[in-house]
Amino acid sequence: MRELVEIMAKALVDNPDQLEVREIAGSDTLVIELRPAKEDIGKIIGKKGRNVQAMRTLLNAAAAKLRKRVVLEIIDQ
């Protein structure tokens, strides 16, 4: 899942080298923390949150196969 988020996020941002992705695994839940550069947060979120919502939808579809729940958090540095 971490790789999927990383690929999607790097395609959206101007500074892919400053992008950090962290995965925190629980028993049924997987939390993925995404830390973009300050100037790239708007690009990750997108207009009216469309980009981040699309990323969450894809993650939930992939997680359903694994019978897990995924939470994508965008963290402002």
Residue ranges and their predicted role:
Residues 1-43, 51-77:
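RNA-contacting regions in translation and RNA-metabolism proteins
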